[in-house]
Amino acid sequence: MKEAYDVLVVGGGPGGALAAKAAAEQGLSVLLVEKRPAIGAPVRCAEGIGKEALAEFIEPDPKWIAADLDKAVLIGPDGTKFTIGDSHSGGKVGYVLDRKVFDRELVWQAAEAGAEIQVHARASAPIMIDGKVSGAVIHQHGKTYEVRAKVIIAADGVESKFAKWAGINTTVPLAELETCAQYIVNDIDIDERANLFYFSYTDAPWGYIWVFPKGHRCANVGIGIAGTKSGEGHRAKDYLDRFIAREFPNGKVTELIVGGVSVCKPLDCTVADNLIIVGDAARLSDPITGGGIYNAMYTGKLAGEVAAAALKKGDTSKKALMVYDNTWREGPLGHALARNYAVKESFIKMDDAKFNSIVHSMSDLSLDEITVKSLVIAIFKANPWLALELPRLLMTL
């Protein structure tokens, strides 16, 4: 580990890997540090991503694809199902990834591009020069290093502290912080080409339950609930245990994962002098699903490119780096996040009776594409009463 680099990337997930690769491909000296001993472990993700989204960055490889999906099934509180199948999606529903292998592949590509990779290396504090973030104190194997960088890219997830260190408000309201639990469950009867989404205030208050196939008779079975709904006997794991006992009583649990994800609005600003914030660290996970792989990869790649352009011009000020914030915020990603936040706020607090009514009304729907916008418009057409209850939501579509 050297004393100085052009770019320091904190975090070895998909966002950090794409940032490091993009910067290294421009000939910059790049250091990526990951606090955990191994890239991709432990997994803290349901591991789903759309096929078109993935194809923007990497060709699919069977070694890190756990399931190739052709349908998504939405299940209401009373068990009523609405299936969005292959005929409506052009075969583009998505994949369930093996994140341990996938993340390592992305970091390996960054290394091949010229980035230096250091694991079990924790960025514990910023190096501040003239009030600007100018590097980080790194702890690794009992040693402490002070690493300076011209640009720091914070890709260290929902727990990230770099934005706070730079004076950016990173507070997430408890109601918008989903507490999550997930089991890998084996020996269960599932459709191995379908992702299942269970919506019920009773079973998952202000959240949902997912069943994502991971191979033969195996699936990620998880839940996210609002932090304000968690309490003794009502924690995410408690709800999940009750669901599994009901739906998969003979399943064999082989792994437990717990964590949290923000479903709030993005940070007001995702850059500062010498600093770019990407992915979950910037609160860019999807407000409806909590998914963040694509958003992290997109903003990570963009951050690496913007950092390289700024360094070539010799200006890494906040003003110079604002092109990053403006690009994602004013583009398709920013618009989708704003719309999905409005959808989340409108639907998440509905009681089970209204959820059942909506799912029942969807039985005759036909969708030309799988998007949040097309689905919500179809729901409004089938449920005109929603226009009276949710007039503001219509304005976002």
UniProtKB/Swiss-Prot annotation:
One of its GO terms (molecular function) is flavin adenine dinucleotide binding. The keyword Nucleotidyltransferase does not apply. Keywords: FAD, Flavoprotein, Lipid biosynthesis, Lipid metabolism, Oxidoreductase, Phospholipid biosynthesis, Phospholipid metabolism. Pathway: Membrane lipid metabolism; glycerophospholipid metabolism. One of its GO terms (cellular component) is membrane. Its cofactor is FAD. Binds 1 FAD per subunit. It comes from the Archaea. Its EC number is 1.3.7.11. It is an enzyme of class 1 (oxidoreductase). A 2,3-bis-O-(geranylgeranyl)-sn-glycerol 1-phospholipid binds at V372. GO terms for biological process: glycerophospholipid biosynthetic process; membrane lipid biosynthetic process. PANTHER family: DIGERANYLGERANYLGLYCEROPHOSPHOLIPID REDUCTASE (PTHR42685:SF18), GERANYLGERANYL DIPHOSPHATE REDUCTASE (PTHR42685). Belongs to the geranylgeranyl reductase family. DGGGPL reductase subfamily. This is Digeranylgeranylglycerophospholipid reductase. It comes from Methanocorpusculum labreanum (strain ATCC 43576 / DSM 4855 / Z).
